[in-house]
Amino acid sequence: MAFDSTWKVDRSENYDKFMEKMGVNIVKRKLAAHDNLKLTITQEGNKFTVKESSTFRNIEVVFELGVTFNYNLADGTELRGTWSLEGNKLIGKFKRTDNGNELNTVREIIGDELVQTYVYEGVEAKRIFKKD
């Protein structure tokens, strides 16, 4: 599938403001700006495996489209939600378990880049990845 590859973060847009809105402290925000995040995505039918490798952690997340699961962000924020495939976009709809606020994510291939867009409490950010 189109998402299957290893992707390395190339640049970010408004990521610091997004993390600030999420409640991430300034020290962690500065570190996260240089996390060298790499995603290895594989899809088998409705099942996705995403291996995240960064300065902070290495984890593997396995999910099925439309099936609710729990996920922890690098700063420890706990989320619960689902991914769905709408056209050529992976749509993530999550709620924080601590306050119930929504975090929505879209992953899409634009040209030769993977663009991951986040929206939380009206603040939008993007992280743009290139194939590694």
UniProtKB/Swiss-Prot annotation:
The UniProt keywords, alphabetically, are: Acetylation, Cytoplasm, Lipid-binding, Transport
What is its induction behaviour? By EGF.
Residue positions where N-acetylalanine is found in the record: A2
InterPro entries in the cross-refs = Calycin, FABP2, Fatty_acid-bd, ILBP, Lipocln_cytosolic_FA-bd_dom
Q: What is the effect of changing E64G?
A: Localized reduction in stability
Q: Tell me the impact of changing L90G.
A: Reduced stability
Subcellular location per UniProt equals: Cytoplasm
Enumerate the residues binding hexadecanoate.
W83, R107
* Broad class of the protein's primary localization: cytoplasm
Q: What is the effect of changing L65G?
A: Reduced stability
Tissue-specific expression: Expressed in the small intestine and at much lower levels in the large intestine. Highest expression levels in the jejunum.
Q: Does the keyword Transport apply?
A: yes
* GO MF assignments: fatty acid binding; long-chain fatty acid binding; long-chain fatty acid transmembrane transporter activity
KW Protein biosynthesis (keyword) present: no
Could you tell me which PROSITE patterns the record lists for this protein?
FABP (PS00214)
Annotated residues that bind tetradecanoate are located at W83, R107
Q: Cite a single Pfam family from the UniProt record.
A: Lipocalin
Family, according to the entry, reads as follows:
Belongs to the calycin superfamily. Fatty-acid binding protein (FABP) family.
Described purpose of this protein according to its UniProt entry: FABPs are thought to play a role in the intracellular transport of long-chain fatty acids and their acyl-CoA esters. FABP2 is probably involved in triglyceride-rich lipoprotein synthesis. Binds saturated long-chain fatty acids with a high affinity, but binds with a lower affinity to unsaturated long-chain fatty acids. FABP2 may also help maintain energy homeostasis by functioning as a lipid sensor.
Q: What is this protein called?
A: Fatty acid-binding protein, intestinal
